[in-house]
C-alpha cells in the first residue's frame, strides 16, 4: 500500500455520474482525517498558503482569486478573511473545517464574491477574473467538496437555492 499508482485503482474507468461520485466518495472516506474547527483556520492558513514561487515577503500569503499580498498571521480581518470556496449558505458549512475548502482572501474580494456560484454571466462570480488560474483551482475545490460530502450538488444552476454549486 501507499503507492500513488495504486491509490485510485479501485475506481473503474467505466464509471460515470452518480456511480462515479459514490466510488470517489467511498475512496475519499478511507483517507486519514484530521478535523479542524473553523476558528483554527486563522492559525493554520499562514503555514499552508505559501507562495510557491517565493516572491512574497516572509510572513505573508497570497490572497485567493487575486494574489493580493495579505498578512500571514490573523489580523482580525484587516487584510484577509476566510473564503468559503463552497459558501456556507449553499451547504458549505458541512465542510468548513476542511483546509482544502477555506482559503485566505483579501477582505475586498471576499465581500465582492459573496455567495455567488461561479460563472461568467450576471449573478455569478468569475474566480479567474483577476488571475485566470483560479478558475481551475476553484473548480477542483468544488469537485473535492462534492466528493467529500455527497449532500453537496454540482449542477448548472445560478440561483441561490439549496446545496447547489455549479457553472464551473
Language model segments and positions:
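Domain-level detector of nuclease and nuclease-like folds
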Residues: 68-168
Amino acid at each position: 500500500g501507499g503507492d500513488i499508482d495504486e491509490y485510485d485503482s479501485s475506481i473503474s474507468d467505466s464509471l460515470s455520474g452518480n456511480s462515479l461520485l459514490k466510488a470517489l466518495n467511498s475512496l475519499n472516506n478511507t483517507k486519514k482525517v484530521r478535523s479542524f474547527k473553523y476558528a483554527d483556520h486563522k492559525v493554520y492558513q499562514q503555514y499552508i498558503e505559501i507562495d510557491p514561487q517565493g516572491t512574497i515577503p516572509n510572513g505573508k500569503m497570497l490572497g485567493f482569486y487575486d494574489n493580493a499580498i495579505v498578512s500571514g498571521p490573523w489580523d482580525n480581518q484587516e487584510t484577509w478573511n476566510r473564503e468559503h470556496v463552497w459558501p456556507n449558505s449553499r451547504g458549505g458549512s458541512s465542510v468548513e473545517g476542511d483546509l482544502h475548502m477555506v482559503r485566505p482572501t483579501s477582505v475586498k474580494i471576499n465581500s465582492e464574491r459573496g455567495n455567488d456560484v461561479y460563472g461568467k454571466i450576471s449573478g455569478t462570480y468569475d474566480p479567474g477574473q483577476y488571475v485566470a488560474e483560479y478558475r481551475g483551482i476553484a473548480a477542483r475545490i468544488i469537485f473535492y467538496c462534492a466528493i467529500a460530502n455527497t449532500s453537496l450538488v454540482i449542477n448548472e444552476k445560478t440561483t441561490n437555492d439549496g446545496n447547489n454549486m455549479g457553472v464551473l
